[in-house]
């Protein structure tokens, strides 16, 4: 089966890593399908694909909606699934209510696993496939003020590690992508979260985070770097279990492994004024 016959579905594909991935897998000869949540986002994807000179189909897909997931996966029967949909889920544990936490876990844990469950029988029947889960360097460590986001990525890491072994004999590779900071609309969303927490005990710390994001945005990587890796994973005979992407991800990984927990805690408190 050639790449041109293989369908790859990318969720959360209207911007950032998702959009870059949908375009790049199309460029590599796969049938690329972008999952989006609104007609406006579908039009945005169509414009970007046209500008890139590739064909990307869009489907309406809310990964937290079981009916949506079943409909799309039954129709597409994809060779490749890229679970990229996400929400910022920022805020101190004390500030994040049940509904925000639920949305984070449904979007970034339950949704990806639901899609994977639906994809596996089709992939098994086709003789193999690829499930690529977009985690984060913060799926390997934890910092203050984004605990629920990081909890979702830690959960995604654990579930991916279990699933990888469970379905390896079926020729289905489960791959974790662990990026650092790459340009995406999610950073703007995180900034908006700060404005919603004006009365928080942690507002001064949120301001420091917001200022840090603004200062670092020009240093953030181009999402095409991640997209090219994902496209290569789709074509690889034996992809690795996980890939760190970005100089900052590699640096943070070393930092997390070398420094004792107490030292990391102290540095975080000093940096954020906690």
Annotate the PLM regions.
Residues 14-15:
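Conserved glycine-rich cofactor-binding loop
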Residues 28-44:
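Conserved glycine-rich Rossmann-like NAD(P)H-binding loop of the short-chain dehydrogenase/reductase
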Residues 60-71, 98-99:
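The beta1-alpha1 cofactor-binding region of Rossmann-like NAD(H)/NADP(H)-dependent oxidoreductases
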Residues 136:
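Residue(s) in the substrate-gating loop at a strand-loop-helix junction
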């Amino acid at each position: 089966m050639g790449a041109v016959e293989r369908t790859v579905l990318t969720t959360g594909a209207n911007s950032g890593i998702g959009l870059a991935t949908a375009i790049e897998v199309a460029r590599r000869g796969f049938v690329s399908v972008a999952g989006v949540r609104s007609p406006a986002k579908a039009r945005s994807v169509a414009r970007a694909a046209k500008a890139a000179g590739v064909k990307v189909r869009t489907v309406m897909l809310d990964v937290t909606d079981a009916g949506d997931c079943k409909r799309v996966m039954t129709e597409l029967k994809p060779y490749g699934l890229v679970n990229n949909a996400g929400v910022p889920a920022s805020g101190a544990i004390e500030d994040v209510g049940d509904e925000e936490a639920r949305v984070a876990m449904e979007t970034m844990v339950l949704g990806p696993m639901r899609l994977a469950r639906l994809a596996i029988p089709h992939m098994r029947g086709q003789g193999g496939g690829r499930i690529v889960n977009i985690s984060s360097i913060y799926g390997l460590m934890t910092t203050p003020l984004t605990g629920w986001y990081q909890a979702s990525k830690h959960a995604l890491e654990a579930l991916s590690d279990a699933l990888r072994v469970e379905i390896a004999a079926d020729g289905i590779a489960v791959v974790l992508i662990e990026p650092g900071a790459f340009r995406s609309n999610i950073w703007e969303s995180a900034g908006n979260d700060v404005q919603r927490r004006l009365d928080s005990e942690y507002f001064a710390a949120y301001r420091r985070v917001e200022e840090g994001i603004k200062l670092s945005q020009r240093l953030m990587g181009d999402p095409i770097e991640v997209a090219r890796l994902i496209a290569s994973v789709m074509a690889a005979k034996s992809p690795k279990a996980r890939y760190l992407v970005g100089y900052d991800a590699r640096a943070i990984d070393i930092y997390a492994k070398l420094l004792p927990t107490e030292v990391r805690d102290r540095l975080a408190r000093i940096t954020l004024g906690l």
